[in-house]
């Protein structure tokens, strides 16, 4: 991952000579640095979550209220802060880490049904906006995250 001085993750600097090597190193090291990694929906959608999803196929699927937790024996998690449910994943893992979507209650039920069909965990951390304290409490309670 490369970041410009103004915090952008894409732009002209992406063509710099060492960008490829730095990106490869980042992908190799991140899973080794702790039991969890966090990213925003923009980054996830740009680099990882680009599957084609037909949400119409999920409109009649019943979805239980509440968080959906899938345990991971490896204990490595990628928390994606995706308050509106925009990330379309191919499967439940990215870079060897299990994906956990951190959502708000504004997410449509078709998206929740899709996540469940892929065995992708999700937690609700706010009504309209994400509440950092609530998301951290749930990360610790459900997944044992301390980093």
What is the predicted role of each segment?
Residues 3-5, 12-139:
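Active-site ligand-binding patch in enzyme domains
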Residues 137-147:
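Short, intrinsically disordered, charge-balanced linker/junction segments flanking boundaries
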């Amino acid at each position: 991952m490369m970041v410009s001085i103004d915090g952008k993750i894409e732009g002209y600097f992406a063509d710099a000579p060492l960008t490829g090597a730095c990106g490869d190193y980042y992908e190799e090291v991140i899973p080794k640095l702790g039991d969890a990694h966090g990213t925003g929906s923009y980054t996830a959608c740009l680099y990882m979550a680009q599957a084609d999803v037909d949400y119409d196929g999920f409109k009649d699927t019943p979805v239980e209220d509440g968080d959906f937790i899938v345990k991971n024996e490896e204990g490595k998690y990628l928390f994606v802060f995706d308050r509106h449910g925009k990330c379309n994943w191919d499967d439940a893992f990215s870079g060897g880490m299990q994906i956990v979507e951190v959502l708000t209650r504004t997410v449509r039920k078709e998206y929740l049904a899709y996540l469940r069909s892929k065995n992708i965990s999700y937690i609700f951390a706010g009504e309209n906006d994400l509440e950092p304290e609530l998301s951290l409490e749930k990360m610790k309670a459900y997944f044992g995250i301390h980093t």
